[in-house]
Each structure stands twice: as structure tokens, then as C-alpha cells.
Amino acid sequence: MSIFTSFLLLCVVTVVYAETLTEGVQNSCPVVTCSSPGLNGFPGKDGRDGAKGEKGEPGQGLRGLQGPPGKVGPTGPPGNPGLKGAVGPKGDRGDRAEFDTSEIDSEIAALRSELRALRNWVLFSLSEKVGKKYFVSSVKKMSLDRVKALCSEFQGSVATPRNAEENSAIQKVAKDIAYLGITDVRVEGSFEDLTGNRVRYTNWNDGEPNNTGDGEDCVVILGNGKWNDVPCSDSFLAICEFSD
């Protein structure tokens, strides 16, 4: 049997088998026939997206423009305190505050009056007065430097007689050997008061001043009112004078 004869038989069998199937089934598929291939159909619908692939490498093109700023995020926590800044420039001077001092001034004046009265009472009871001067004695013995400091502390000065009357008052107050505010520290033999003025009244004891040992630069008053020169470091009573 030739190839062509076999092909014809196959076609006949196919047709008979197809008719048999169409008798029992309505609306069935068309019978397969031996014919040339038909035209391609339309493309089918897109399939489902596949799984996400791995991130690719950056492209080789130019970088695009920066996009617009995003929304403002939430406020962050407070930061640590910063370093202390430099001191600013000095400000303008402010206006003077108004304050009524009349009451305070009145109280100060009253206090001064009471202190003056108390001072006068002390001076009258414990001192000798000559003119406008009061002479007050200390019960302690000390060097001339300490006598000066003591009298200055009470706004007075070391007693310095300017005449016989003042010398007599100092003698009565002292009742013992006491320093006078007279020295020849600057020039030996030239006696001055503690302000640098040369003294004009003197009442030296016999043979005085003698500067025994080349170190007697200060002056004391004795119990009889006479004067001696002595070393300034020796300790004697302090007599202070105050002006009324």
C-alpha cells in the first residue's frame, strides 16, 4: 500500500469517528479535520506578577533632581544643655532708685546724740579735761606703736601736752609712767609730735634727754610730770587725747 493510499484511509476513519460522536453530544467542539494550519489568535491576557526580585545595582545614568521636602516629622527629645556663652557687653546705667531716707537719717542723728552723751559721761568720769581736750588713760602697758593703734581705733591720738596745764592733766590721769606722742625718730635730738610738727613746750627731767644706748627715741611722762627719753619698744601706759 502506498503512502498516499494510507493517508486517505486515515482521513475516512477520522470522519466516521467524528460523526459517531456528534450523534450523542449537542454543542460539542468542531470535528477535527485534516486541513492546513489556521491563523494565529489574538495575544492572551497578561499573567499574574511574579515574585519580587532582588534589588538591582545602581544605574549608570545621571542622578535625578532632588524631590520636594517631605512632611515635618514629630518633635524629638530635648537635647543636652549647651556650653555657657560669653559674657555680654555691659548694659546702660539704670535710673537711680528713689528712696526716702529721712526716717533713717533721723534715727542716725538720734543714735549719734546718744553716743555723744555716753562718750561725754565716760570722759567726765574717767578723764581729765583741759579746754576742749580730754585725756584718758589705759590700764594696760604697751609699746608706742600699740598705743598709737589703740588711740586711733577710738578716733583719738597719743596724748601730747602743748602747755603746763595739759601736762598736769596728763600727769593726774596717768598716775604712773606713760607714753607721750613725742619722738626724735627722724632727726636725733629734734623732738616732734606724731604729725611731724616740732614741739615747743617741753618739761624734761634733769639730765634728759640723754639717748642712753643710742636707742631712746620716744618720750614718757613720769609720776612727777617730768619727761624722759626711752626706747619705743618698752611698755608703758597709754594716754589718749580726744577733742570735744
From Swiss-Prot:
Cysteines paired by S-S bonds: C151-C240, C218-C232
UniProt entry tagged with the keyword Nucleotide-binding: no
MF annotations from Gene Ontology: calcium ion binding; calcium-dependent protein binding; D-mannose binding; galactose binding; identical protein binding; phosphatidylinositol-4-phosphate binding; protease binding; signaling receptor binding
Cellular component annotations (GO), alphabetically ordered: collagen trimer; extracellular space; serine-type endopeptidase complex
Residues recorded as bearing 4-hydroxyproline in the entry: P43, P58, P69, P78, P81
Biological process according to GO: antiviral innate immune response; cell surface pattern recognition receptor signaling pathway; complement activation, classical pathway; complement activation, lectin pathway; defense response to Gram-positive bacterium; killing by host of symbiont cells; negative regulation of viral process; positive regulation of complement activation
Feature: compositional bias, Low complexity: 65-74
Post-translational note: Hydroxylation on proline residues within the sequence motif, GXPG, is most likely to be 4-hydroxy as this fits the requirement for 4-hydroxylation in vertebrates.
Glycosylation sites: N210
Subcellular location: Secreted
Domain C-type lectin, residue spans: 129-241
InterPro entries: C-type_lectin-like, C-type_lectin-like/link_sf, C-type_lectin_CS, Ca-dependent_lectin, Collagen, CTDL_fold
PROSITE patterns listed in its UniProt record: C_TYPE_LECTIN_1, C_TYPE_LECTIN_2
SMART domains for this protein: CLECT
Domain Collagen-like: 38-96
Residues making up the signal peptide according to the UniProt record: 1-18
Disordered: region residues: 40-101
Coiled-coil ranges from the UniProt annotation: 108-126
Domain of life: Eukaryota
Composition bias type Basic and acidic residues, residue spans: 45-57, 90-99
Subunit annotation: Oligomeric complex of 3 or more homotrimers. Interacts with MASP1 and MASP2. Interacts with MEP1A and MEP1B and may inhibit their catalytic activity.
Chain's role: Calcium-dependent lectin involved in innate immune defense. Binds mannose, fucose and N-acetylglucosamine on different microorganisms and activates the lectin complement pathway. Binds to late apoptotic cells, as well as to apoptotic blebs and to necrotic cells, but not to early apoptotic cells, facilitating their uptake by macrophages.
Domain notes: The coiled-coil domain mediates trimerization.
Name assigned to this protein: Mannose-binding protein C
Biological classification of the source: Eukaryota, Metazoa, Chordata, Craniata, Vertebrata
